[in-house]
Amino acid sequence: MTSPLDGLIAEHAEIEGQLADPAVHNDPAKARALSRRYAQLAPVVDLARELDRVEGDLAAARELALLDPSFRDEVQDLGEELARLNDRLRAYLVPIDPDDARDAILEVKAGAGGEESALFAGDLLRMYLRYAERRGWKTEILDANPSDLGGYRDVSVAVKARGPAGPGDGVYGRLRFEGGVHRVQRVPVTESAGRIHTSAAGVLVLPEAEEVDVEIDPNDLRIDVFRSSGPGGQSVNTTDSAVRITHIPTGVVVSCQNEKSQLQNKESALRILRARLLGAAREKAESEASLARASQVRTVDRSERVRTYNFAENRISDHRVGYKAHNLDQVLDGELDEVLDALAAADLDARLAAQAS
């Protein structure tokens, strides 16, 4: 067994034993957390088995190659496969973020730039929906505030995986680097003189919280209802179906008007509220932890301007890792893996460096 994985494999076996104990399921929060962690560690066991197999095959092929030179090609192939597996192993050499395996709630908000910014927010929404489709994830629009020209002033989407994932490969683990300000440079549809304008939209990515993850006292909530409004502010419903929830202790406010049912809007608003409260708690913990590592390394954290989309040059630039590519049309069609891989690799390198220092 490969030593860097031994602790994680032992943890996987321990959790398996805990989940087999009926008493654990009397505590839904604990059972859910254990199940999530168990699924997250499953790829570790698979990787360990694969490493053992390839190492054994390589040792045997090397011995055979001493007697028969025709086995040298097999030695080379197995050596390359082992190198790929060891590269995957790097992801397990740093602590696995338990939130990486969670589903996510993604919020896109138009920023500076008026209607053009709202149109760009719509472009970003489509990009993420197409990416989710490519990954086989399920999406659900929780709330949407459309603009006059078909964009979005703000929109919230739940993104769910269909099965367990490895480190950094869950929905939240994959999308978490998207948080920040995204900037667009192009000629707006509202521009008659053909001048290039710059506008922006903000993206927030939160791990989705279950009810058992975040306890909300109903007495801490102020719930207001109002009529839904569409583009231009016109009413789209004759009943007070839209819901605004204020979490009094923190001042967090969530509004939902996407559904015709007040109950459905309330449920969606509570989902977003739980995610925001969990995200706030996570950021507080990360902020405290970052004080200890700040002098060691700068990881790929959210920053003000994370990415620029230049339509005239068909160029995408991620400013955190110096990534540039002239395939903007493909990226906006959901081909995000290349830039997300670059961000994940930079983050892993930074965390490995911090761990070694």
Swiss-Prot record:
SMART domains referenced in this protein's UniProt entry, alphabetically: PCRF
GO cellular component, one term: cytoplasm
Modified residues (N5-methylglutamine): Q234
This protein's UniProt keywords: Cytoplasm, Methylation, Protein biosynthesis
GO molecular function (one): translation release factor activity, codon specific
Subcellular location: Cytoplasm
One of the Pfam families matching this protein, by short name: RF-1
InterPro entries in UniProt: PCRF (IPR005139), Pep_chain_release_fac_I (IPR000352), Pep_chain_release_fac_I_sf (IPR045853), Prokaryotic/Mito_RF (IPR050057), RF-1 (IPR004373)
Record PTM text: Methylated by PrmC. Methylation increases the termination efficiency of RF1.
UniProt family annotation: Belongs to the prokaryotic/mitochondrial release factor family.
Function: Peptide chain release factor 1 directs the termination of translation in response to the peptide chain termination codons UAG and UAA.
Protein name, UniProt field: Peptide chain release factor 1
